[in-house]
Amino acid sequence: MAPTNTAAWLTAANSPLAVGPAPYTTPSPTQLVIRNHALGINMVDIVVQQLGPALFSWIKFPHILGSDIAGEVVEVGSSVTRFKPGDRVVAMAAGLTEDNTQGAFQTYSVAGEVVASHLPASISYAQAAVLPLAVGTAACGLFQKNYLALQHPTIPPKPTGETVLIWGGATSVGSAAIQLAVAAGYEVISTSSPKNFDYVRGLGASAVFDYASPTVTADIIAAFAGKKSAGALAIGGFDPAVNVGVVQACVDVVVKSEGRKFVAMAVQFDPAQVPEGVGAKFIFGSDLKDNEVGPAIFEHFLPKALEEGVFKCATMPLVAGEGLEGIQGAFEVSKKGVSAQKVVVTL
C-alpha cells in the first residue's frame, strides 16, 4: 500500500496555504521519492503565492510550491543508480513547474536524480534545506554556457587567474556562489553589509565591499584594476528601486574591467540598463537539470564537497515552523527579512 501523502496547497493567488491530502506518486525511471524532513522557504514562493499566474503563466491551481528539500529516500526509479531507500539526501524540488508531484511543500516529493546529492550524517536536515535552490541558481549563473560559462568546481580547485564579482555575498544564493566560484578556481570580489564582511570573507571572497556605500561601484572597479574579469553575478531582492542600483553597479564594473562583459542576473532587470557589448540574462535556477551543469554540481562536486567540508551550509537555518501547517507562518517570518540566514520548516 502506498504511503499517505499530505501537502500545503496554494488554491488561489493571494490565499493562505491549505493543508490537505495529496496523491503519492511513484517515481519515473530517473526519479526518487523523498520523505521530506526539512523544507527551505524562498522569496519566490511568497511572490508566487501573491501573484500566481500573473508571475508565471503556467502556474495552475491548486498548486504545491517549494524548491528546497532534505530528507530520506523511500523509493527509486528503475534507472537510478546513485541512491537507494534509506539514503539521506538533499535535493532541488520543482515547485515552479506544472507538476505538483515535484513541489517541496508536501510529505513525499518526487525529485530528479540529477538534482539530488547524498547528505553526510554530520549535516542536519535543517542545515541542508538552505542549499538546493541557492546552489542551483548560483550554478546556473556561473557555469551554464549561455551565462558566465566558468569552468566547473573541482577538489582541489584549479586556479584560473580570473576574478568574478558576486553582488550580494551574504544571501543564500551569494553564499553558494562564492563557494562554487572559489572551488572552480576563481578569485571572488563581493558585497554585503559591513556586519557580514567576516562571514563573506569566510566563504572565500578576497575582498568585500559595503553595497550601501556611495562609492561602492568605484571601489570595486578599482579592485578589478590589473585583474582579468570573468564577469558578474548580480543578486537582488524584491525592492525594484534597489535592484536597479544592483544591476547598474554590476554593469558598470564589467564595462570598465578587462575581460568578460556579462552579468548573470539573479534579479529582475530592465534590458535598457544593459549597454551594447554587454551580455545579460535572467537566471532560472532549475535549468541545470536539463544540461551538463546538473550532474557536474549535484553528482560530481557537492556530495564529496559536503563530506569533506569544502562546501558548507553557510547560510544558517532559521527554523520558523514545524509541520506543513507551519509553512504559512514561516512565509510571514521570511517577509520581514533575514540576514545570512534562511527560513526553514521541519517536518
Protein language model features and the residues they cover:
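Terminal helix/beta-alpha structural elements that buttress the NAD(P)+-binding lobe
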Residues: 2-28, 35-76, 81-347
